[in-house]
Every structure is written in C-alpha cells, then in structure tokens.
Regions:
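Non-transmembrane "mature" sequence context
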Residues: 1-131
Length: 131
C-alpha cells in the first residue's frame, strides 16, 4: 500500500486541474465504470461519460467537468494508496467527516467549493493513513 505524501498530493492537484477532461473521464470510466461516474457527475445518461472520454468527444458543462476533476482526485488518491475497489466502497460509504453522507453524494450535489474540498480532504486523510 502506497502512502500519499505532501509532494505526491501537490502533484495530483496539478494533474487533476491540467489533464484534458477527456482523460479524466476515461480514467474514472476505467476505475469506476460509466454508471458510477455518471452518478458522481449528476448525469442521467451514463453513455455520456464514454463520449467525453473519446479523443474527439464533446466538452462537458463546467459543473460536470469540475465534478469529474474532483472525482479524479479522490479516486486516484485512494486507488493509488489501496485499489479501485476500495475507492468505490469508500465513495458509497457514509463518512462522519461529511455529516454521515456518502462522499459520492456530496461530490454529486456540491454547490459550494468547500463541500468538494471536504470530500477531497477526507480522501487525502485515508490515503495518507499509516499503520
């Protein structure tokens, strides 16, 4: 299990904000699947994630792109520290740091930056955990 360090966290922050959104969508589609990624972004059409992931695919609306980028950060942190299955389970489990809400619900419905930041902080704590 790889532990997330501060330099790795900074690198991941830069990567999540600079990668083309199509690559971000492709990563999430690979790790979570289309349905779960669509749920995270609030999209009703799961196939839209596949369209975003194509090299010649459309650009998502700003709010969807932001949710994709936040989801990427969270899934990447946990997948790198543990694995994709742990990331999936963590996204759907209630979290006391998020007022007992599931992280995926908070990301999906976030209207303020601090809501997404709380999820990212909770994921960072899990990924930085040392035994």
């Amino acid at each position: 299990m790889a532990v997330l360090t501060a330099p790795q966290s900074d690198l991941l922050d830069r990567e999540a904000s600079t990668l083309p959104v199509g690559e971000v969508a492709a990563y999430l589609q690979d790790k979570l699947g289309q349905r779960m990624t669509a749920f995270l972004t609030g999209l009703s059409d799961a196939k839209q994630i596949g369209r975003y992931a194509r090299a010649d695919g459309p650009e998502p609306r700003a709010a969807v792109a932001q949710r994709l980028r936040h989801g990427y950060k969270v899934v990447r942190m946990i997948s790198d520290a543990y694995d994709a299955e742990t990331a999936k389970a963590w996204l759907f489990g209630t979290n006391t740091r998020l007022d007992d809400e599931a992280p995926i619900e908070v990301l999906r419905t976030a209207e303020k930056p601090e809501q997404s930041t709380a999820v990212i902080r909770a994921a960072r704590q899990l990924a930085s955990f040392q035994e």
